[in-house]
Design a protein with these regions (language model features):
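Active-site neighborhoods and metal-handling regions in enzymes and metal-associated proteins
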Residues: 2-620
Length: 620
């Protein structure tokens, strides 16, 4: 299932008409503007087809963006990764591109103030507006403009063939891979919730799909690249209820949930919980909502709190991400097993690539298909963990580049190919980037590649005291680049789920990141190590492995941690400028390749693959 809107047959005039149709709806609703974010009711990173409304309305296919339509104007905000793409896709639609972060670009509130007169009313879909986004969008709006959730979703009327809710079946994630039962995880969630000030009962509504899947040891298929399912989860001090489409659940899963102490109800039945609280018959209750709660849910429970003194409402950070971030021993072993399978597929692919490039027949799209096919041959393969980024030459310098039939470059036997890919297996998730030399390189390409490699190695080698955060660790990857006048704009590392989302928090490694100071690294946390340098219009370099933080002894100065590199795949040695590496960096690279060779050789049946691996992991 690939949830992409087929828009290849549409013209800019079609999107102009869709915007005009929304304007007609606005007049009927007595609204002056409507906000269309890139969100679903669960604040998901990847959206089910049904909620790709911004893309349907505007024709802009980037993963980040927000559209606002008024009775006379329309605008779309996106970040620097998508400026060029948005400019091309919005041409002729009448939608103005707002380049976030650029001088002179107003934010949404400023634009609405300048566009709407006094008494203007801005509408939005309450289900598809998180509290976090609402606060950031409208905090600067004056009282002369009103903002309210609309009672009706315009896309139910305008999008005539709008997809239904996905209804893929659920599956169990075995405890042998999870390491903890659902019952044990529910108990951990309860223990992590704030204590009630008195004798009140506690009630927590979970709306993040990856948190629900992790807590219940269940997986689904409602969202591309993520083994998730649409649901809410209610957790009280002594019970739990899963709100989801009952047709997703087989008798096996229903019996399993009953054993774990979880009842099942319809997807939107959480609304009855809010209504029951409003009656005052439930008794004194502390209702905790996560910071990612959507505005429709927040309003429903706010009404309950306003209706009776028995209900106290508080929005809190979800207790689940810190629990999920520390992997159990079973999860760690599962991730190691997934890396072995993925490494074998990568070796087969890289050997094939070396043979194919000189023939001049392969493109960015064709190599993606080949790599996916090789991964699919591995036991327990469940699908890709994100859309593959295969960027040859100048395309490697484009953030989040995704090749299409129109843009896919043909690979030539020279220059660099940046390949960022990953997969889900039944026991774990992978995320790996390799930059590969396809032929002769310039001195600049070799220098940049080696600087990225140095940063990658220095983070992988880091030993650090307990309590160290990702903000502090970020310098390990960037310091050498900074000395040469290079840098990169994205984060250095993110958590990785266990057959869950490839992007997982709350920890991360990133500069200029206040949130990174709040969550120190701990034994059992996974994180990517992915520094890069991107030379605009020429080439890009990124090298990425997944790391596992582990205890590394104690000294008079406290307990220390270090990283185990989980990813097992050769790092291309052909672009390396050895003279730029220190002796310690060379020793790390040789030792890593020894590990890769010993681990992967037994998994390869093809003699040519074995020979390629031996050569690719030679000492330098």
């Amino acid at each position: 299932m690939i949830n992409k809107i087929n828009m290849s047959h549409l013209k800019s005039s079609d999107y102009k008409e869709r915007v005009n149709a929304l304007r007609r709806w606005l007049r009927g609703e007595r609204l002056n503007a409507y906000v269309v974010p890139t969100l679903d009711p669960h604040n998901s990173e990847y959206l089910p087809f049904r909620w790709q409304t911004r893309e349907w309305l505007t024709g802009f296919t980037g993963s980040a963006g927000l559209a606002v339509v008024t009775l006379e104007k329309a605008a779309l905000w996106t970040d620097s990764r998508y400026f060029l793409q948005a400019e091309e896709q919005l041409a002729g639609t009448g939608i103005e591109l707002m380049r976030e972060g650029m001088p002179g670009t107003p934010d949404v509130a400023q634009w609405l103030e300048a566009t709407l007169g006094e008494g203007g009313v801005v509408g939005f879909c309450g289900e598809c507006m998180s509290k976090e986004l609402f606060d950031s969008l409208f905090a600067g709006l004056s009282e002369r403009i009103a903002v309210r959730a609309s009672d009706n979703d315009p896309f139910d009327y305008l999008w005539r063939d709008r997809p239904d809710m996905p209804r893929t079946l659920l599956s169990l994630f075995p405890e042998e891979y999870a390491g903890l039962s659902a019952h044990a995880k529910l108990q951990a969630v309860r223990a992590a919730l704030p204590a009630a000030p008195g004798e009140e009962k506690r009630l927590f509504i979970m709306n993040d799909l990856s948190e629900i899947a992790w807590t219940l040891n269940l997986r689904g298929g409602d969202i591309d690249f993520n083994p998730l399912f649409l649901a809410y989860l209610l957790v009280t001090d002594d019970a739990a209820t899963l709100f989801t489409d009952r047709h997703k659940i087989t008798e096996e899963e229903r019996a399993y949930l009953t054993r774990e102490g979880v009842a099942v109800d319809d997807y939107k039945a959480w609304q009855y919980v809010a209504r029951e609280l409003r009656t005052g018959r439930v008794g004194e209750t502390c209702v905790y909502l996560p910071a990612s709660v959507n505005m429709a849910q927040l309003e429903a429970f706010e009404q309950a709190a306003e209706a009776t003194d028995d209900v106290r409402l508080e929005v809190i950070p979800s207790p689940v991400p810190p629990l999920r971030a520390v992997k159990t021993e079973a999860e760690r072993e599962g991730m190691r097993a997934a890396m072995l399978r993925d490494g074998a597929a990568m070796v087969q692919f890289l050997r094939w690539l070396d043979e194919e490039v000189p023939k001049g027949l392969q493109t960015e799209l064709s190599i993606d298909k080949k790599l996916t096919a090789l991964r699919a041959e591995q036991p327990g393969f469940k699908g890709l963990s994100f859309p593959t980024i295969a960027g040859y030459a100048a395309h490697g310098a484009i953030g989040h580049y995704e090749a299409t039939e129109e843009t896919a470059a043909r690979l030539e036997p020279r220059g660099l190919l940046l390949l960022d890919s990953g997969a889900h297996y039944d026991c774990g998730t992978t995320d790996i980037t390799r930059t590969v030399a396809l032929g002769p390189l310039t001195e600049e390409e070799r220098r940049v590649y080696t600087l990225v490699l140095k940063g990658h190695i220095n983070l992988a080698r880091a030993r650090f005291p307990e309590g160290t955060t990702g903000l502090e660790l970020d310098l390990a990857a960037r310091y050498g680049m900074w000395q040469r006048g290079y840098d990169f704009g994205h984060g250095t590392g993110h958590g990785v789920g266990t057959y869950l989302g490839v992007h997982e928090g709350p920890h991360q490694i990133r500069k200029n990141c206040r949130a990174c100071t709040l969550v120190p690294f701990a034994d059992g946390m996974t994180v990517t190590d992915e520094p890069g340098i991107y030379v605009s219009d020429r080439f890009g370099v990124r090298i990425e492995n997944v790391l596992l933080a582990h205890e590394d002894g104690a000294t008079d100065f406290g307990n220390f941690l270090a990283f185990e590199t989980l990813t097992l795949c050769p790092i291309d040695l052909r672009p390396v400028a050895k003279e730029l590496l220190t002796g310690e960096e060379i020793a790390w690279l040789n030792a890593y390749h020894d590990r890769v060779r010993v681990a992967l050789l037994p998994l390869l049946a093809n003699v040519a693959d074995k020979a390629w691996l031996e050569a690719a992991t030679r000492h330098i």
